[in-house]
């Protein structure tokens, strides 16, 4: 039940992040709605299509789709000045949503009888897929291709989750919580101390 409600929170926060980016780009209401929804459900959609294990999650149960749409519309109406929001709020809630989405992705892969490598990949895709679609539609460099410790947190958390379950036979729910906590802590540490990955850069001479 806790994971269910955290999933709802994550869906809402991801939708808000899409709407805020659309607002900065001065999109019309339809564009705002599209960016909010694809950010919230895009990763899970890619995952379910890749696993080909039953219908896409929001087709089977439209709760997440409804949450994404309602959150997007409410954000359009209520958040006219994003600067009034505490700076820590969205990044922290985004970190919670990211951790939950990674855990859900790994679980779904294992339930589809996938191996640990694919499970970790599906967890990462669930966590970052929507953001990639959002940034591509907005013609921005996706966050995971920048120096932010974002996908890295997903990968490490997913590995902990998959290893605990597949190698050490930890119950799936317990392994899921372990992976979520690791993902969350890494992401929060990156936010708190502005941790970034080193960059790969070449000058004009290729040096």
Curated annotation (Swiss-Prot):
UniProt xrefs under Pfam families: Gly_transporter (PF03458)
InterPro entries reported in the protein's UniProt record: Gly_transporter
Keywords: Cell inner membrane, Cell membrane, Membrane, Transmembrane, Transmembrane helix
Membrane spanning stretches: 1-21, 30-50, 59-79, 86-106, 113-133, 149-169, 171-191
Topological type in the membrane: Multi-pass membrane protein
Record GO cellular component, one term: plasma membrane
Compartment(s): Cell inner membrane
Stretches of the chain found on the membrane's Cytoplasmic side: 22-29, 80-85, 134-148, 192-207
Domain of life: Bacteria
Keyword Protein transport annotated: no
Sequence ranges on the Periplasmic membrane side: 51-58, 107-112, 170
Family of this protein: Belongs to the UPF0126 family.
Protein's recorded name: UPF0126 inner membrane protein YadS
Organism: Escherichia coli (strain K12)
Gene that specifies this protein: yadS
């Amino acid at each position: 039940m806790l994971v269910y409600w955290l999933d709802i929170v994550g869906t809402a926060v991801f939708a808000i992040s899409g709407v805020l980016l659309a607002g900065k780009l001065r999109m019309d209401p339809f564009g705002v709605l599209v960016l909010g929804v694809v950010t919230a459900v895009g990763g899970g959609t890619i995952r379910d299509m890749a696993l080909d294990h039953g219908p896409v999650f929001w087709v089977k149960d439209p709760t997440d789709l409804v949450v994404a749409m309602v959150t997007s519309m409410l954000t359009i109406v209520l958040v006219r000045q994003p600067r009034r929001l505490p700076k820590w709020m969205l990044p922290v809630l985004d970190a919670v949503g990211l951790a939950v989405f990674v855990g859900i992705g790994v679980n779904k892969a294992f339930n589809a009888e996938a191996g640990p490598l694919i499970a970790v990949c599906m967890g990462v895709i669930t966590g970052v897929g929507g953001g990639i679609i959002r940034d591509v539609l907005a013609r921005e460099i996706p966050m995971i291709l920048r120096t932010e410790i974002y996908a890295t947190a997903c990968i490490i958390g997913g590995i902990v989750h998959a290893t605990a379950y597949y190698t050490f036979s930890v119950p799936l729910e317990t392994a899921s919580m372990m992976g979520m906590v690791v993902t969350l802590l890494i992401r929060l540490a990156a936010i708190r101390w502005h941790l970034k990955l080193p960059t790969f850069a070449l000058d004009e001479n290729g040096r």
